[in-house]
Amino acid sequence: MVHLPLRTVAIPEAAARVHDAWIGELEERLAEGPATWNRLARDYLVQLAAPDVTDYDERVADPAVPLARREALLALDPRNVTLEPEYYGDIDAERFARVKPLLWLWYTFDRCLPGGQNVALPVRVRRALAPHIFARCGRNFKCFHNVEFSFGYNMEVGDDVVVHRNVLLDDRGVIRLGDRVSISDYANIYSHTHSIVEQKDVTSVPTVLEDDVRITYHATVLAGVRVGKNGMVGAVAVATKDVRPWHVNVGIPAKSVRVKPNAPPDAYVTERIARRPPEA
């Protein structure tokens, strides 16, 4: 097996200067506080998606502008849209109202230029937004496009975490990601579950991925599961129970098939242990 660290990719200096200037401006505006974030999101989305619009309110109110165009402009302001989590009975409406403008900016930025599959700038934009959305966000957070959250405010993220494209992080309960966690494309991490009898009966519990955990392509981790340090959930697996440290669990439901070869001796202990109670 060949060791292949990531390459450093340079962009033209002129583009890099614009990137730096805009990230600096974004961070300054974020620092002004939540009371300004609806306007912040609207201003940037208008600049990105409708750069010809110089007077937003006038254009939205103008009966000469086609209705569909006015609807598109309205949707650039987070106050004019609703997101699915706003309909959940367990939402903290005040906390969500605080982060909603930044979530809407994040999601919509991903669907227009210069977002999407571009890496150089969008990773920095998401890194700037995340500390203002999450309960905690460590250093060097790296997130690719089309990642979605439930509430956002129940995310606890360590250092050097990488989340790849099209991941769902359902933080209706709490999701804790330790240092150096890697979540691959199309994975789903849940922290709530529904009764099989009554769909409206919902249980939310913390889901924990400890340090150096890897959740691989299209895998799912269900609510309340703890993946231990250096544990791994294989491609397309569904983790319904805890994954022991250093173990590789695969299949549906996911079961341990091996221990990583660099694991310490105690990782090979196989006796059954009692499942820990859910964290408060």
Each language-model region and where it sits:
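Short beta-to-alpha loop/turn elements within the nucleotide-binding domains of ABC transporters
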Residues: 225, 236-237, 243, 252
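Short-chain dehydrogenase/reductase
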Residues: 182, 214, 232, 238, ...
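Short proline/glycine- and basic residue-enriched helix-capping loop/turn segments at helix->loop/beta transitions
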Residues: 136
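Terminal amphipathic alpha-helical/low-complexity segments used for targeting or macromolecular assembly
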Residues: 1-132, 257, 262-280
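Flexible, glycine/small-residue-enriched loop-and-beta-strand segment within the central core
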Residues: 112, 116-127, 133, 145-227, ...
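Conserved catalytic segment of ABC-fold P-loop ATPases
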Residues: 228-229, 244-246
